């Protein structure tokens, strides 16, 4: 089965399931669905940053400070976060990612999904999926901040990261 054929839950403004559809149709019709974002850090606290491959269905060739993806039909956010983190980082046996917050991403142009944000400590080395990741590295928070204005980032990941920073600043 191709990624476009994967069945996703369609959800309403309250994150309640109202139907299912293939991923390709979900994207083409701008149907609200669910996604997870996992901020992966190494033992030194550096953040895993990567550039998506040019073949990705959404936001190809852009940089991201999260690993993650869509939540499959019937899958919990927590299970999806662990599955996606292990798949994209190419590691197994990760601890269950810690949930941080959830928000509704909506770019106003037909891309909208409930987004659950997590964090996890990741042992090295990582072996990212070549189908998903064109480049990767671990950056300090300062290095990441320096690149926010110069690299082209996935807009949903950037929205999640801005909320994460705002939450830290409010503490």
Residue ranges with predicted function:
Residues 2-37, 43:
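Acidic, metal-coordinating catalytic segment for phosphate/diphosphate chemistry
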Residues 91-98:
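Short, structured loop/turn "capping" segments at alpha-beta junctions
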Residues 17-20, 45-51, 125-129:
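Short, well-ordered strand-loop elements centered on a beta-strand within folded domains, enriched
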Residues 21-24, 61-63, 73, 99-171:
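Nudix hydrolase/Nudix homology domain
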Residues 1-4, 169-171:
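Basic/polar N-terminal segments that are highly enriched at the extreme N-terminus
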Residues 15, 92, 103-107:
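Short helix-to-loop capping/linker segments positioned immediately adjacent to catalytic or ligand/cofactor-binding
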Residues 25-36, 42-83, 87:
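Conserved Nudix-box catalytic region and its N-terminal flanking loop in Nudix hydrolases
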């Amino acid at each position: 089965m191709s990624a476009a054929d994967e069945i996703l839950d369609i959800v309403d403004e309250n994150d309640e399931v109202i139907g299912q559809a293939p991923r390709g149709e979900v994207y083409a019709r701008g149907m609200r669905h669910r996604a997870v974002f996992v901020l992966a850090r190494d033992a030194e606290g550096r953040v895993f940053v990567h550039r998506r491959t040019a073949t990705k269905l959404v936001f190809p060739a852009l940089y991201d400070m999260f690993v993650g993806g869509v939540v499959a039909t019937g899958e919990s956010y927590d299970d999806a976060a662990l599955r996606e983190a292990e798949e994209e980082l190419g590691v197994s046996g990760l601890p269950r990612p810690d949930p941080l917050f959830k928000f509704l991403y909506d770019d106003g142009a037909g891309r909208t999904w409930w987004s659950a944000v997590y964090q996890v400590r990741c042992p090295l080395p990582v072996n990212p999926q070549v189908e998903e990741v064109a480049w990767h590295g671990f950056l300090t928070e300062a290095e990441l901040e320096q690149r926010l204005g110069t690299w082209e980032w996935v807009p949903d990941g950037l929205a999640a990261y801005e909320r994460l920073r705002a939450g830290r600043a409010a503490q």
